[in-house]
């Protein structure tokens, strides 16, 4: 096979629809817009959510709840993500950020107990689930709860 013999995969290069170019093209005359009416006009059509004048669904349903602007934004990670550290490492939120285990530390980091921990680590400055504390201590590590 040579460079000039290369061809794209069958069906991967689909020609665009050329509408309104005569009846022989299959998309002439009304160009796929049907007969008259709002949708046949240029710029025609209705906005998203419009139901023909009937009260639309997004206005029929009541508003509900609010966003608490004082909510603590805590980043959570599972135990098995801590296996990247060497035995005896002191793991802090800053170290997790530096090693890109978390992308940002907002109002803190919480360690959850999913997975297994194979290293003996000292974890500081984080929140923990009960199962995470048990697994860290079972692996020979220490937990310093904030």
Swiss-Prot record:
HAMAP family found in the cross-reference section: Ribosomal_uL15 (MF_01341)
Family per similarity comment: Belongs to the universal ribosomal protein uL15 family.
Molecular function in Gene Ontology: rRNA binding; structural constituent of ribosome
NCBIfam families: rplO_bact
The name this protein goes by in its record: Large ribosomal subunit protein uL15
Gene Ontology cellular component terms for the protein in this record: cytosolic large ribosomal subunit
The encoding gene: rplO
Organism, scientific name: Clostridium beijerinckii (strain ATCC 51743 / NCIMB 8052) (Clostridium acetobutylicum)
Region (Disordered): 1-54
Gly residues composition-biased segments: 21-31, 42-52
Function summary: Binds to the 23S rRNA.
GO biological process terms on file: translation
UniProt entry keywords in alphabetical sequence: Ribonucleoprotein, Ribosomal protein, RNA-binding, rRNA-binding
Quaternary structure and partners: Part of the 50S ribosomal subunit.
